Structures are given as C-alpha cells and as structure tokens.
From Swiss-Prot:
Extracellular side: 43-78, 129-138, 194-198, 303-321, 372-379, 437-445
InterPro entries assigned to the protein according to its UniProt record, in alphabetical order: GLUT (IPR045263), MFS_dom (IPR020846), MFS_sugar_transport-like (IPR005828), MFS_trans_sf (IPR036259), Sugar/inositol_transpt (IPR003663), Sugar_transporter_CS (IPR005829)
Gene3D superfamilies documented for this protein: MFS general substrate transporter like domains
Localization, UniProt: Cell membrane; Apical cell membrane
Designated gene of the protein: SLC2A7
Sequence positions that bind D-glucose: Q294, Q295, N300, N331
PROSITE patterns: MFS, SUGAR_TRANSPORT_1, SUGAR_TRANSPORT_2
Record topological domains on the Cytoplasmic side: 1-21, 100-107, 160-172, 220-281, 343-350, 401-415, 467-512
Transmembrane segments: 22-42, 79-99, 108-128, 139-159, 173-193, 199-219, 282-302, 322-342, 351-371, 380-400, 416-436, 446-466
Stimuli inducing this protein: Expression is increased in presence of fructose.
GO cellular component, one term: apical plasma membrane
Disulfide bonds, paired cysteine numbers: none
Descriptive protein name: Solute carrier family 2, facilitated glucose transporter member 7
Entry's Gene Ontology molecular function annotations: D-glucose transmembrane transporter activity; fructose transmembrane transporter activity; sugar transmembrane transporter activity
C-alpha cells in the first residue's frame, strides 16, 4: 500500500454500480449494431455456399459462354471467405486513430458506413449480375468487424462500473454468437438460403447498422474518454449520472483523475513505444497470448470438422444444418452463462475451466476420429466432443478475453494495445483458415493434438501470469502488473486535472 502524504484525505469509498436502464440500453444498442455484425457476416456464407457458387458460375457463363473450372471456382470462393479476416486486420489498424479522434461512441457510429454500403451492394449483386460486388463487400464488412471488435469492448468497458465490467464486457461475444446463430437460422434452405432469398440474406446486415444509427446517438460517450482524453469533467460527470442513476460518483471520478495524471506523465503511447515499454511488457504479452490462444485452440477446426463428424454418426447431409443450429444454441446458452458467472467466479476461473474442457475434448476427439471406423459407436461420442468443445470455448476463451484486454491497460496505452490485440486476432484467424486444411490433409485427426497442446500452454500462462481482475479499478490492476514488470509507479500527486485534453510528446502521437 502506498504511503499518503500528510494531510491527504482518506480514499473515497466507491458505491457499487447497478445495471441502470441507460447503461443497459446503451450496451444493447452498441453491441447489436457492432458485435452482431461480426458474428452474422462470419457465418452467413457457410451453410448456403453451394447457392453462392452456383450464382458465381451462372454469372461467369453469361459473360464467357463457359463455366468456371474447379480451380477458378476454388480461388473465387476462397477470396469470398478469406477477404473478411483480411478486412478485419485493416480495420484493427484503423481503430486507434478513430477512437481517439472521434471517441468510442463516434467510432461505432461512423463504422456503420462500412456495414450499410456493403449491404446495399450485396443486395443488388444478383440483379447487377456481378459476383465481384460480394467479394468487395466482404472486404468492407471485414473492416467494419475489425473496427467494432476493438472499439466496442473499449466503449463497454469504459461505460460499466467495476462490479459490472465483466458482465457488460462479455456482451461483445454474446452478440457475436447471436449474430452467428441468426445467420445459421436465416441461411437454412427453407428460409433465405436458396436461389431466390440469398440477396436478402446478405442485405440484412444493414438492419443492425441502421438501428444503431437511430439509437446510439441518444446515449452518452465514454466518461473516461471525456475526462481523460478531452479534459471535460463536466461532460464525464453528466454521463456518469445517467449511467449510474445516482450523484455519488466522486470515487469513480477520482479514479479517472488518477488515470489522467498517469496519461499526462506517460503521454499517449504509440504501438512501437508500447512494444518497447518495460512497464507494459506482461500486459502486452498477455493480450497476445489470450487472442492467439482464442483462435489457435481449434475453434475453427472444430467447425470445419463438424459436418464430417455428424455424417459419420448417421446424420443425413440434409439434416446436418439443423445439428449445426443445435450447436449454435449451446454456444449462446454457454456464452450467456459466462456473462452471468464472470462477476461471481472471476475471469481466471472461467478461462482455465474453458481451456481445460476444450483441451480434453480435442484429445478425446482425436481418439474418436482414429477409431470410429473400427468402433462405429464412437461416432456418437464425436458429436458429444464437438458440443463439449463449443460449450468450453463459449464459457471462457471466447467471451472473457474481451473483458480482460480492456481491464489490463490504462487509457494512455489502451488504443495502441487494442491495435496489437486486433491485429493478432485477425492474423491468427486468417492463418488457421489458410493452413488448417493443409495440416488436416497431412496429419488428419492428429491435428487436434496440436490444439490440445495449445489449450494446455495457454491455460498454464493464464494460471501463472494473469491476475484476477474482478472488482478492481483500472489503476489497481495497473499496480498489480507493475509488480510483475518490476517497475515502480510514480507517486500520485494530489492535483486536479487542467481543462483541455492531455498533451503528448510528438514521438508518441502517431498510431504506430
């Protein structure tokens, strides 16, 4: 505990925050218009892929009087799928500039442009007989997802009081999963996943963006952004009054003032400066491990293998899409369960339990895939493994990193940290999508042993390095990491912040 100077008033006890209507509605508006987009567009092209390929082929035939060969079709479809994470990588690199210049809420509002324009283009692509519009739109939608995947957790984490930060923060992943699930439902052949309905299926991505444009302007900007980066304590106080539903906010304001003083001392960190700074070494490594572990632990491989596992268990190909919807229900239920438990059990317990379940499921699934031809009954165990893996990933590795990555950085470094975090997320997403088919072809079922090993290593890192952040302020978490980084934080001076935004040295003002 730090020694206080003589005459320093005792710390102001914080008042436990409650989920006020303004905070709830702001969370729903922000998450539905942003995270939902990510999940919906991640999944919407998967089930009806044969319908899209047929449109590509018909369009090509009308232009060239011949159908595409297999290699060209594979190339075009690979571009359709893989352009989304590449666009996400670009969006993650843009987000740092946007969140500082336009604010967290302003960034989310501007980002809707990258959803509405592609929705229109994809909606008219059939009439225009231009499959290129779909490929281009997937890139732009990736940019939208890349921006929202970083800006949304930042906004929600800065809106919520510390005792609700975990639950509110997991809403990012909850709405991603809801987006995935509704895309699975709408893309069923009986609904919109057919030759007549697919333009509407793709254009629906514009609806959440329009709803966010109509609702989010009525909710406050992040009070931490207003006070720490804009120096506007009056606006921050007004926002807190609306978000908390009471006027007893001095403890929270003082915590923000402490962060503001830290930002004035450090300046606004660039990505390069962040990577070189000893005082943030373990925080930076932690978000890299969390985001890489999330993608490299096998979730995309499980999805890739799922239909094969269902078929081997006797599920007809025409019915496998409904089993996929069932796995989506498990995904939603367990992600919501995580949101309920994260403030009771803490972040570490959910992460460790999730990786433990995922690693165990991967090991058992390896055995199932190797021996199911000899023992047909094992194929049913394969379905259980898929559902168990999805449940494990949904309770920890999927939702909790969105909370932790906001909590372990102060305002001065959060922008740069989220750029690194987003880049790792999208790069590993792309790498797995690109390399897994080759790995699977080379070693088959043994590929899941690799994923089990990654789950184990990630869990060990979490157990050894990442502290429990439940119920702690950003400043308190920063002090915990300062001890691990073996740096001494400067004594906080009792001073009020000046009006106006904090200044930074020229070397620290750029995004990179």
């Amino acid at each position: 505990m730090e020694n206080k100077e003589a005459g320093t008033p005792p710390p102001i006890p914080s008042r436990e925050g409650r989920l006020q209507p303004t905070l709830l509605l702001a969370t729903l508006s922000a998450a539905f218009g942003s995270a939902f987009q990510y999940g919906y567009n991640l999944s919407v092209v998967n089930t009806p892929h044969k319908v899209f390929k047929s449109f590509y082929n018909e369009t090509y035939f009308e232009r060239h009087a011949t159908f595409m060969d297999g290699k060209l079709m594979l190339l075009l479809w690979s571009c359709t799928v893989s352009m989304f994470p590449l666009g996400g990588l670009l969006g993650s690199l843009l987000v740092g500039l946007l969140v500082d210049s336009c604010g967290r809420k302003g960034t989310l509002l501007i980002n809707n442009i990258f959803a509405i324009i592609p929705a229109i283009l994809m909606g008219v692509s059939k009439v225009a007989k231009a499959f290129e519009l779909i490929v281009f739109s997937r890139v732009v939608l990736g940019v939208c997802a890349g921006i929202s995947y970083s800006a949304l957790p930042m906004y929600l984490g800065e809106l919520a009081p510390k005792n609700l930060r975990g639950m509110v923060g997991t809403m990012t992943e909850v709405f991603v999963i809801v987006g995935v699930f509704l895309a699975q439902i709408f893309s069923l052949q009986a609904i919109l996943g057919n030759p007549a309905g697919w333009p509407v299926l793709l254009a629906l991505t514009g609806v959440p963006a329009l709803l966010q444009l109509l609702t989010l302007p009525f909710f406050p900007e992040s009070p931490r952004y207003s006070l720490i980066q804009k120096g506007d304590e009056a606006t921050a106080r007004q926002a807190l009054r609306r978000l908390r539903g009471h006027t007893d906010m001095e403890a929270e304001l003082e915590d923000m003032r402490a962060e503001a003083r830290a930002e004035r001392a450090e300046g606004h960190l660039s990505v390069l400066h962040l990577c070189a700074l000893r005082s943030l070494r373990w925080q930076l490594l932690s978000i890299i491990v969390l985001m890489a572990g999330q993608q490299l632990s096998g979730i995309n491989a499980i999805n890739y293998y799922a239909d094969t596992i269902y078929t081997s268990a006797g599920v007809e190909a025409a019915h496998s899409q409904y089993v996929t919807v069932g796995s989506g229900v498990v995904n939603i239920v367990m992600t919501i369960t995580s949101a309920v438990l994260v403030e009771r059990l803490g972040r570490r317990h959910l992460l460790l339990a999730g990786y433990g379940i995922c690693g165990s499921a991967c090991l058992v699934l390896t055995v199932v895939l190797l021996f199911q031809n000899r023992v047909p009954e094992l194929s049913y165990l394969g379905i259980i493994c898929v559902f168990a893996y999805i449940a494990g990933h949904s309770i920890g590795p999927s939702p909790v990193p969105s909370v932790v990555r906001t909590e372990i950085f102060l305002q001065s470094s959060r922008r740069a940290a989220f750029m690194v975090d987003g880049a790792v997320h999208w790069l590993t997403n792309f790498i797995i999508g690109f390399l897994f088919p080759s790995i699977q072809e080379a070693i088959g079922a043994y590929s899941f042993i690799i994923f089990a090993g990654i789950c184990l290593l990630t869990a060990i890192y979490i157990y050894v390095v990442i502290p429990e952040t439940k119920g702690k302020t950003f400043v308190e978490i920063n002090r915990i990491f300062a001890k691990r980084n073996r740096v001494k934080l400067p004594e906080e001076k009792e001073e009020t912040i000046d009006a106006g935004p904090p200044t930074a040295s020229p070397a620290k003002e750029t995004s990179f």
